[in-house]
A protein has these predicted regions:
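Catalytic-core "active-site belt" of small-molecule-metabolizing enzymes
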Residues: 1-138, 142, 149-200
Length: 200
């Protein structure tokens, strides 16, 4: 609903959860995310890492919202997906998983807060991937698992993003943050190539 209000088309004819492949170049754990638009925003998501064992963590799917009105898959490649470098072993967290909470903040304002019980569990996500992805490897891949509406039900923009995964029962949390750097501002006004080609 919040993205639809911004003119972003959701492929409702494709069964949810919808899958958007991204390359490894679109993952980053650094302190800055570089963009070319003032209309970009993050959104907190559970991240699954499938290796010899399953681990869970948290990341921010930072997205160019202007480009997203034209192509959702393209917008996913235009900005990196930020990743917190800490993961928990699924076996250690599975029994208390439904009590975990995700949060994000933009410019120190609470942007999202949601319990992970609102989402499919990591095992359910991986089961769906096996049904819908061609040649899914047995291991060595990651999955960002989708997000939830912001607290004010509107897309937020800002310069500083922070996100968190907390397990209250185990008193553990994963935190990460990054600054947004609009590199288009390096080019003087009047010399910037438009984000979209002129129509007509």
């Amino acid at each position: 609903e919040e993205v639809a209000k911004s003119g972003i088309y959701i492929a409702s004819d494709v069964p949810a959860p919808r899958i958007y492949p991204i390359g490894l170049h679109a993952l980053d754990t650094g302190s800055s995310v570089f963009v070319q638009s003032a209309q970009t925003s993050g959104e907190v998501e559970i991240v699954i890492h499938v290796g010899d064992k399953i681990h869970v963590g948290v990341g921010s799917d930072h997205t160019d919202r202007a480009l997203e009105t034209v192509s959702i898959p393209g917008s996913k490649q235009a900005c990196v997906n930020h990743l917190a470098p800490t993961f928990w072993a699924w076996d250690d967290i599975a029994d208390t998983w439904d009590d975990c909470i995700m949060r994000s903040w933009v410019d120190d304002r609470l942007y999202q807060e949601v319990g992970v019980s609102k989402f499919l569990s990591p095992p359910d996500i991986l089961s769906i991937l096996k049904e819908r992805v061609n040649n899914l490897p047995d291991k060595n891949y990651m999955v960002y698992c989708g997000t939830y509406v912001s607290v004010d039900k509107a897309l937020g923009y800002g310069n500083k993003w922070r996100y968190q995964l907390e397990t209250p029962k185990l008193k553990r949390q994963i935190d990460a943050q990054y600054d947004v750097v609009d590199i288009l501002n390096e080019v003087k006004s009047g010399f910037r190539v438009p984000l979209f080609n002129p129509q007509g």
